[in-house]
Design a protein with these regions (language model features):
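Core catalytic region of metal-dependent phosphoesterases/phosphodiesterases
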Residues: 1-66, 158, 162-165, 169, ...
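Active-site-proximal loop/helix segment associated with metal-binding centers of metalloenzymes
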Residues: 53, 67-159
Length: 176
């Protein structure tokens, strides 16, 4: 899930040996090219990527019923370490820019290597999330996310800027 190659196997193998099922939502630095290669299945009422038999990625905007409780999931997050930009390896000046940014300790990421546009939910994922919450009358027992709603994020650190996802999570917080 991290590199999208055989190097992931050892770490995923360790997770698979744990005496429980590992569940996770995605964040902002996932390898979405690799993650989206895994099969999608229905699991406890919502969609998952099955990474291993006991390692599951809980997809965005889903509701899961576990032990009589409802869990709503909304992964994703805005990268805060890209002040100097996102580089494209296909750009003719990639190596020049990369070397300069590394020398100056720049804050940057590389498209489809360390940054993916999918770090934030798509409009379709927001729409699906709203439909899921409407079906549940915006009442769930637990909300699992990677980032916090805007009001909570402000209490944690003023350096984090609100974005569409944190505002959406704030809407959920105030409506639930």
């Amino acid at each position: 899930v991290w590199n999208g190659d055989k190097s992931d196997d050892a770490q995923l193998g360790k997770l698979e040996t744990l005496p429980f099922t590992v569940l996770f939502v995605d964040g902002n630095h996932e390898n979405f090219d690799a993650l989206n290669e895994y099969p999608i299945e229905q699991w406890h009422g919502g969609k998952v990527h099955r990474i291993r038999p006991h390692v599951l990625h809980l997809m965005r905007g889903q509701a899961f019923e576990l032990q009589g409780r409802t869990f709503f999931t909304m992964g994703g997050a805005q990268s805060h370490d890209i002040a100097d930009g996102i580089l494209d390896m296909d750009s003719p000046d990639f190596y020049k820019r990369y070397d300069a940014l590394r020398r100056n300790r720049g804050q940057f990421r590389i498209n489809h290597i360390s940054w993916w546009q999918e770090e934030l939910p798509s409009n379709e994922e927001y729409e699906h999330a709203r439909q899921t919450l409407e079906r549940l009358n915006w009442q769930v027992d637990y909300i699992i996310t990677h980032c916090a709603p805007t009001a909570i994020q402000r209490k944690i650190s003023a350096s984090f800027k609100p974005d569409k996802l944190t505002d959406f999570l704030e809407e959920i917080r105030t409506r639930s």
